[in-house]
Design a protein with these regions (language model features):
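Catalytic cores and adjacent binding grooves of peptidoglycan-active enzymes
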Residues: 33-36, 153-353
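Bacterial N-terminal signal peptides that target proteins for export
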Residues: 2-15
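N-terminal low-complexity, Pro/Thr/Ser-rich intrinsically disordered segments
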Residues: 32-59, 290-292
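Active-site acidic/histidine clusters and adjacent loop/turn architecture
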Residues: 48-113, 174-184, 189-192
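Acidic/His-rich structured neighborhood in mature extracellular/periplasmic domains
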Residues: 117-172, 231
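Extended, low-complexity, intrinsically disordered C-terminal regulatory tails
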Residues: 35-48, 94-125, 196-218
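Envelope-exposed proteins and targeting segments
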Residues: 106-108, 132-136, 191, 225-229
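C-terminal segment of classical bacterial N-terminal signal peptides
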Residues: 19-28
Length: 353
């Protein structure tokens, strides 16, 4: 039997198991239902079976996730205690390939932040997205020339690329042409759908990038993201349960849509009605609000340590698509000034879904 046929067979078995679990009283494992972040945020291991994404980037889950190794050629995983270095095989293969390609342009190595929880889903703290194993945060801070201890990976501070004494301004003491080359390299991979950065960083790229601007439109401005950039992969081919995001519009994004971020509107506090009653607390997202398969995935048998190791090796062997830009430009040494305090961020954020 060929590899493709075997893969189809495994996928069919997973689909049958999911359907059978769902057939048992609807949500047998969660008959009383529960807040999804409490369920998925407390699962330590991925589910057994084939890898797949279910739902959308901000409302879904994943099965058969693969763990990014704690370190590899050109990268180290950070904040290990969060247990958020789990992704789809395509994401793990992308990170490993991108890390090697980044070193070719002179970047010392990648520090990898959150990817997803073992079975995806909403998190107890932090992200609205990162739910289906196809999102990853990559620090702007370059990797040191040593393997960090677990404690160092917890305590090493972020480096903001902004000048906190000014409004939405990149700090040229910390930002360098190599930072620009790094994020533009990331955008050049065909499987990368979007990259989220701070509006000031997007503006800096628009003003200073002299190379090929074909992939500039993939780089999207968003609140925060001054200490890391957020890479989002497209739904993999042949993934019917992964809900794709609307395509990025034409153009490089260096237009009125970027200028809006530098107006008062996105930063203004919402107007309060003094006569209005206090708003009710928002209803938590429940397991039943996610795609139906997610209840089965949350209650499915955990992958064994041996199976997880095999999946990790298979993901590492998976060929990642080549970047589509020239990576042979001269190297540039990154700046490494330490940052001031975090940038204040509005409480209201647009959806990343």
């Amino acid at each position: 039997m060929g590899k493709q046929a075997k893969g189809v067979g495994k996928a069919s078995l997973l689909a049958l198991s999911v359907m059978s679990i769902l057939a048992m009283d609807g949500y047998s494992a969660f008959a009383q239902d529960a807040p999804a972040k409490q369920v998925f945020g407390n699962i330590a291991l991925p589910s057994a079976g084939p890898s797949a994404s279910y739902g959308s980037y901000a409302k879904g889950c994943q099965s058969g996730a693969v763990a990014l190794p704690t370190e590899g050629q050109g990268f180290q995983a950070m904040r290990l205690s969060r247990n958020r270095r789990w992704g789809q095989p395509q994401m793990i293969a992308f990170i490993e390939r991108f890390a090697q390609d980044a070193q070719k342009i002179g970047w010392p190595g990648l520090l990898i932040g959150d990817i997803s929880q073992p079975r995806g889903g909403p998190m107890l703290t932090g992200h609205a997205s990162h739910q289906i194993g196809l999102d990853a945060d990559i620090w702007w801070r370059p990797m040191p020339d040593r393997v960090m201890s677990a404690d160092q990976r917890e305590s090493t501070p972020f480096i903001s690329m902004l000048d906190k004494s000014k409004f939405l301004t990149v700090d040229d003491r910390k930002w360098s042409p190599l930072n620009a080359k790094l994020v533009m390299l990331a955008a050049s991979y065909p499987q990368v759908e979007r990259i989220f950065v701070n509006p000031a960083i997007k503006q800096k790229l628009c003003q200073t990038w002299k190379g090929d601007r074909t992939y500039m439109g993939k780089i999207r401005p968003i609140y925060g993201h001054d200490e890391h950039f957020h890479v989002r992969l497209e739904c993999p081919p042949g993934a019917p349960n992964c809900k794709p995001q609307a395509a990025v519009g034409a153009g490089d994004g260096c237009d009125k849509s970027l200028a809006w971020w530098f107006s008062k509107e996105p930063w203004a506090a919402p107007k309060k009605d003094p006569n209005a009653k206090p708003p009710k607390p928002p209803r938590p997202v429940m397991v039943s609000d996610l795609p139906r398969a997610c209840a089965a995935i949350a209650s499915a048998q955990s992958a064994s340590a041996g199976a997880t190791l095999i999946r990790n090796r298979e993901a590492s062997a998976m060929p990642a698509a080549q970047p589509e830009m020239d990576t042979n430009a001269p190297s540039v040494t990154p700046n490494a000034l330490m940052p001031p305090a975090d940038i204040p961020r509005p409480s209201s954020r647009p959806s990343l879904n």
